[in-house]
Amino acid sequence: MSDKKTHKLVTDEYYVRPQAAWEKMKAARSMRQTVYLYGTTGSGKTTFVMDFLGRRRCCYASVADTGIDEIAGMMPEKSETYTIFVIDDLHLLETEDDRSACGHLIEKMSARTDVWLILISRAPMPKWLKTAFVRYIFVTIGEEELCLSQKEQEQYLEKWELMPTAVTVRRIWELGQGNP
């Protein structure tokens, strides 16, 4: 096994947790159910995962800079304790061979009781991952669940010490719909 990329993820003091996504993550964690998060660039996918994991150690790999073979080499040995494993940027897998290899690896990891797998992508569930999704019943969190509620948006503005008028707050909501 190659050297693991183990990260202690840190949180942002200005971050406001989207409760809809938070509740789904808590349920998935309690059952160690694979999670598939997706959303457009800037929708807060990776930040949300970092905040949720807090100071917990995890193995993190982005397919942007880590090959599938290297990610497979990072997979921990079976253990009494569980490992949190995050694979980011799945949308960057371009070749059929990479997608197939990654799909196989995800199936292996999802089947293990000592691994909690979190997958992050810009795209909804891709066709090449549907078999694993059905077999292992992934929890899916889409970008709409990463959006803030009106109350959460107001908390965000307060953290930045911004005090817009009620009219401005409504306008911000109309324009952004809670997009982080």
Residue ranges of model-derived segments:
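Conserved adenine-nucleotide phosphate-binding loops and their immediately adjacent elements
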Residues: 1-23
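Sensor-1/coupling segment of RecA-like P-loop NTPase cores
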Residues: 92, 105-132
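Conserved P-loop NTPase "ATPase switch" module shared by AAA+ and STAND
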Residues: 77-102
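Conserved AAA+ ATPase "SRH/arginine-finger" region at the nucleotide-binding site
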Residues: 139-150
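Amphipathic alpha-helical "lid/sensor" segments that cap RecA-like P-loop NTPase cores
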Residues: 42, 47-48, 140, 158-180
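Conserved AAA+ ATPase "sensor/coupling" helix adjacent to the nucleotide-binding pocket
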Residues: 135, 152-163
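Conserved catalytic segments around the Walker B and adjacent sensor/switch elements
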Residues: 54-68
